[in-house]
Amino acid sequence: MAKIVVTGGQALHGEVNISGAKNAVLPILCATLLADAPVEISNVPHLHDVITTVKLLSELGAEVTIDEGTLAKGRSILVDPRSVTHQVAPYELVKTMRASILVLGPLLARYGTAEVSLPGGCAIGSRPVDQHIKGLQALGADISVENGYIKATSHGRLKGGRYVFDMVSVTGTENVLMAAVLAEGTTVLENAAMEPEVTDLADCLIALGAQIEGAGTPRIVVQGVERLGGGHHAVLPDRIETGTFLVAAAMTGGSVTVRRARPETLDAVLDKLTEAGATITTTADSITLDMQGKRPRAVSLTTAPYPAFPTDMQAQFMALNCVADGVGVINETIFENRFMHVNELLRLGADIQVEGHTAIVRGAERLSGAPVMATDLRASASLILAGLVADGDTTIDRIYHLDRGYENIEEKLGALGATIQRTA
């Protein structure tokens, strides 16, 4: 099984291009099922979850063409949904990726029926699907859970309605939003997720002919239309990848510019990096972080839905706190079981104490390389970051987690001066 070996001690310097957002491209690919003509998606990242989604669309009968493109143009995917013949998303594909649940709303709205296996993916807590089910029921769907499958039917078109999410759910908002686009009448979604990826999905749907207002706010209003046509959409840059490279630069005392970025989607993260002592300069599509000659200061943070601090950056900031000056307190409010990286960081010499959903991190002068194991996507990134500043070699196992969400991370870090390689 492939591993990544990181030799610590090199400050990162240079420029890196940010890929398209994992958490935007997956729902957007699923949204192509709503159309009655081909849809082209560009700025698509090379990720395992994208491959899985393409397999799922193909399994449903869609014709999918991948254009690897060029370094400047990027990768694009053309989906022709006119050949869709199946409305069942099987366990074999869904079990490896939770985002597969996002075909539920589009299939139901377009074809009046859908069967989707209960999802798998990262092992970081329960992540219930009840918000998806309740939201679709509010649009008139009949839904049951039988033999591990969510089975949904509509009697004719879905009917517009009002739904208040019990809790903020990104994928729940996306699923119900996609279904509402083809529903009859007006749908109002309250307590909707405000993440930039939700807004990007809405922008894609609007480009195909949907009528949506309020995406990026807690209240989204959808005027249902009878059909969506074809079109093109470019996926927004990945704010979590952006944040990960900025933390890497801060931890190593380097200076890095990330390009093809969207600084306005990262306010909470940039505020914490500034608090840690970094000098940050932004343009419309780039961020430069300078930490040369400085040790980061410990920062305390609490994860919460956007625009607050993202749970997907929690593990990376824990790694930063491991070598920072002072004590940082991290409160995780989004997912349970999201401190699984703590035991691995302890193997590198970190000083971390966990009390329930809170981790207290005391910065150490240095970490020491050791064999460690990735437990989920963002945890794997935190172990690479820790390896960048640890003495000697850090060998990270189970890096298939990493390939679900980061495109060529070892090549990008290597180009910035890191000593990092993938081994068979």
Swiss-Prot record:
SUPFAM superfamilies in the cross-refs: EPT/RTPC-like
Residues the record marks as active site: 122
Main location, first listed in the record: cytoplasm
Protein's recorded name: UDP-N-acetylglucosamine 1-carboxyvinyltransferase
Catalytic activity: phosphoenolpyruvate + UDP-N-acetyl-alpha-D-glucosamine = UDP-N-acetyl-3-O-(1-carboxyvinyl)-alpha-D-glucosamine + phosphate
InterPro entries linked: Enolpyruvate_Tfrase_dom, Enolpyruvate_Tfrase_sf, MurA_subfamily, RNA3'P_cycl/enolpyr_Trfase_a/b, UDP_GlcNAc_COvinyl_MurA
Matches recorded under HAMAP family: MurA
The species this protein was found in: Xanthomonas euvesicatoria pv. vesicatoria (strain 85-10)
Cellular localization per UniProt: Cytoplasm
Record-listed phosphoenolpyruvate binding positions: 22-23
Signal peptide: none
